[in-house]
Design a protein with these regions (language model features):
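"Short basic amphipathic alpha-helical interaction patches in structured regions
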Residues: 79-87, 106-107, 127-133
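Ligand-binding loop in jelly-roll beta-barrel domains
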Residues: 96-126, 214-243
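Conserved short histidine dyad/triad with adjacent acidic residue
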Residues: 3-31, 41-59, 69-76, 80-83, ...
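Conserved hydrophobic/aromatic beta-strand scaffold that supports enzyme active sites
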Residues: 45, 64, 91-93, 112-116, ...
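Conserved, well-structured core segments that form or line functional sites
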Residues: 100, 110-191, 195-203, 207
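Short acidic-glycine-tyrosine-enriched beta hairpin
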Residues: 77-95, 184, 199-223
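Structural motif
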Residues: 72, 195-197, 228
Length: 245
């Protein structure tokens, strides 16, 4: 199964008087084509046109990850009780568990992903919350199947996460070429085009477009010039009930 999610078909939102623009390939309660699946509940790509601040607000149960694609974010939460700076290439993992509150200050020009997972909500709320920063220096690119790859989460990563069967990677393509990506037919994937124009399994996509994939073992990817893909892999079938189901 391949489902295209062009930027204009995602859930798009503007807040803070036009200073914060978000396109969301996964968002609960908005549009049927971007509804949650597997353990992936929410995925937002945001651009800060001006400085923005989200005041202290609560979360529980979900595992929430923020990836700084460019720019700067300062984060405060009630687990650490300090403001923590995050820069380009860094990411954070909030295991909100029994409950946590946090604030975010986002600098002008920043782009980031915020992604929520259900790690088994009904069990997570029995655990104490935690917050962990990870820095770009600890995630050097490697060559995987002939493609320059950063492994954020999954086998080969130092990141500690609760969500079972989760893999998150960033792929860099530096020349015109065709690639055949090996997929697991027992997994679901969403690929997000971070940079460049690409053709994925015969479908033309550009920056900020996305594609959902399942029940495939191979994926043909072609870039005309350099480009980047960011993808999330989760189990096709989970062994626990999701909070939204």
């Amino acid at each position: 199964m391949i489902q295209l999610l062009k930027k204009e078909d995602q859930f798009n939102r503007t807040i803070f008087n036009g200073n914060f623009l978000a396109n969301k390939p996964v968002a609960n309660g908005t549009k049927d084509n971007v509804k949650p699946y597997s353990s992936l509940f929410y995925w937002s790509h945001a651009r800060a046109i001006g400085d923005c601040e989200f005041g202290l607000h609560p979360h529980e149960g979900f595992e929430i990850m923020t990836f700084i694609l460019e720019g700067n974010v300062s984060h405060y939460d009630t687990a650490t009780k300090v403001w923590t700076p995050l820069e380009t290439g860094d990411f954070q993992v909030i295991q909100s568990n029994s409950g946590i509150e946090h604030s975010e200050r986002i600098s002008k020009g920043t782009r980031n992903f915020q992604i929520w997972f259900d790690p088994n909500f009904y069990e997570a709320v029995k655990k104490a919350p935690s917050y962990t920063d990870y820095h770009s220096k600890d995630f050097k690119p490697i060559m995987e199947d002939g493609i320059k790859t950063i492994i954020y989460v999954g086998k080969g990563s130092i990141a500690n996460v609760l969500t079972p069967g989760l893999s998150i990677k960033r792929l860099f393509f530096d020349k015109k070429a065709k690639y055949s990506l090996q997929l697991d037919k027992n997994s679901s994937y969403t690929f997000y085009v971070l940079k460049g124009d690409t053709v994925i399994d015969g479908n033309a996509l550009t920056s900020d477009d996305a594609v959902r994939i399942s029940n495939l073992e191979n994926l043909e990817v072609e870039f005309e010039i350099e480009g980047e893909l960011f993808y999330i892999e989760t189990p096709l079938v989970s062994n626990y009930k999701m909070i939204w189901s």
